Design a protein with these regions (language model features):
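Conserved alpha-helical scaffold segments that buttress catalytic/binding sites
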Residues: 56-194, 199-489
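Sec/Tat signal peptide C-region and signal peptidase I cleavage site
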Residues: 51-54
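Bacterial N-terminal signal peptides that target proteins for export
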Residues: 31-40
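Bacterial N-terminal signal peptides
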Residues: 41-49
């Protein structure tokens, strides 16, 4: 029997019944009654969890009578706004308008069932994935003990390529040399260590785990900057630091390991550049740097369509909560946090007010459309200049418009252009001392043209160029004379 049929056909029994007292043909109905009770309890929990997201929802006046005719339970479900956690508001209004009474009752019953399944129930759901608490290691891919490292080779970056300028073979970020241990970073006086974090466990979308290897394989990093004519790999000591291990069964265990590895990298003096992976890895990336430099000792510049400040969800570690967790745990200061490019369904009145209360300087696409990108970028630059000397730069590729980044895990329309984004990143990475960088949420399988990977590499390269321009002693917006004029009349 379909869920809607169960809900439509049930009638409350005159006295409490036990399944053992029922004939076989009535047991299904009795079990459905128990199911209804459970769903009503779960619905109540869902209402409490969704109060922030549905705070602005009210039933249109012309549909109020139709909703009242559905009965108390269905009416409460619709009026609470819990239904719009399952279907879009516009679709719900359409269904309330066009369906007859029986069809509408059946639909609402189905929505209540779905809503109940979405909520967390201690009786049905585990609070966490069971872990072996006696295990003393992160995973089977345990890092090589320090005592065994000297037996392999001398410390320092090394090449895995047969040719000096390889176009094939083992792919590395920008064709860079490889480093494996902190000793390699120290011996090579490495400026930037680029590491993959192939995690997509913290997102409802998949394939972000493929992004590090796809960005390596396309090999469009380390290109010369046409503005300053600086070649970042000639100015900086850059290495491919490999992929960090992730636990594909536990985001929590992955978060701890990534934070430890980022902290270890930062202690060598190299800038950890993380290539994700989903945006849940923003939290351990920033936490790892803070472990080394100190909490609230640096600013965070976050380019994204999403505020990542969900406070009412079932989970506490996901790609929708990284900024909330960083602020809640006091790892970063709200006054030193800047967000650019916000748009989409997560940008609501409740979230923006919360960000404002935390002191976060956010810039939505509404602001950019009203005032123009250059004016808003100027405001962002001033905010960065007034901020700490050190900055962590984070880029969720959803900041870009779908025309230039269709492979974003949580794609949103009407975003920034690639030239706008790289211009902003290049400037900030040249104007401030970058202590960490990460790019996340690229899902390569969504774009067979490779345009999204090309643009993701361009974003990473923009920060490398900015760091190289700063190390070269140039002003952030330095332009080489040859790049401006061919010298002929």
């Amino acid at each position: 029997m379909a869920p809607a049929q169960v809900w439509q056909n049930l009638r409350p029994p005159p006295v409490p019944l036990h399944s053992a007292d029922l004939p076989v043909e009535n047991m299904l109905v009795h079990e459905a009654m128990n199911g209804m009770a459970r769903y009503l309890v779960l619905f109540g929990l869902l209402v409490l969890a969704s109060q922030g997201a549905a705070a602005d929802w009210t039933v249109p006046g012309e549909l109020q009578a139709r909703v009242e005719a559905l009965g108390a339970a269905r009416r409460a479900f619709i009026e609470s706004g819990a239904a719009i956690q399952v279907v879009p508001e516009r679709q719900l209004i359409h269904e309330l308008t066009v369906r007859d009474e029986d069809e509408l009752a059946s639909l609402v019953d189905d929505l209540m069932v779905v809503a109940g399944e979405m909520g967390y129930s201690p009786e049905r759901d585990m609070g966490a994935a069971p872990l072996n608490l006696t295990s003393k290691r992160f995973s089977s891919a345990v890092t090589t003990p320090a005592a065994l490292r000297k037996m392999k080779r001398e410390a320092g970056p090394f090449s895995v390529h047969r040719y000096l300028n390889p176009r094939s073979g083992v792919p590395t970020f920008g064709g860079a040399k490889v480093a494996i241990w902190p000793e390699d970073l120290i011996a090579g006086k490495v400026d930037v260590a680029i590491m993959g974090v192939p995690s997509d466990m913290g997102s409802g979308q998949r394939d972000a785990a493929s992004a590090p290897d796809e960005m390596r394989a396309l090999n469009t990093i380390a290109t010369p900057d046409t503005q300053s004519l600086v070649r970042p790999f000639e100015v900086l000591a850059v290495v491919d630091y490999g992929n960090l291990e992730v636990d594909r069964m536990s985001v929590e265990r992955t978060v701890n390991h990534v934070a430890e590895m980022v902290a270890e990298t930062a202690r060598t003096g190299a800038v950890p550049m993380m290539v994700g992976g989903d945006t849940s890895m923003l939290y351990p990336g920033v936490k790892g740097v803070a472990t080394t430099l100190g909490e609230r000792s640096f600013g965070l510049l976050h380019f994204s369509a999403h505020p990542d400040a969900e406070r009412h969800g079932d989970h506490t570690i996901s790609d929708r909560q990284a900024i909330f967790r960083l602020l809640e745990d006091r790892i970063i200061d709200g006054g030193d946090t800047i967000q650019v490019g916000l748009r989409g369904p997560d940008v609501d009145q409740d979230t923006l007010q919360w960000l404002r209360d935390q002191g976060v300087r956010y810039h939505t696409m509404a602001e950019i459309r009203r005032h123009g990108f250059d004016k808003v970028l100027g405001r962002v630059r001033r905010e960065v200049e007034r901020g700490p000397n050190d900055f962590f730069v984070s880029v969720d590729v959803s900041a870009l418009a779908p025309a230039e980044m269709i492979a974003a895990g949580r794609v949103e329309a009407n975003g920034l252009g690639i030239e706008q984004l790289t211009k902003a990143i290049r400037h900030v990475c040249a104007a401030k001392n970058v202590v960490g960088f990460e790019i996340t949420d690229l899902a390569p399988m969504m774009d067979l043209s490779d345009l999204s990977v090309i643009n993701a590499n361009a974003v990473l390269n923009a920060c490398l160029v900015g760091i190289a321009v700063r190390k070269s002693g140039h002003e952030p917006d330095y332009v080489h004379p040859l790049a401006l004029d061919h010298g002929r009349r």
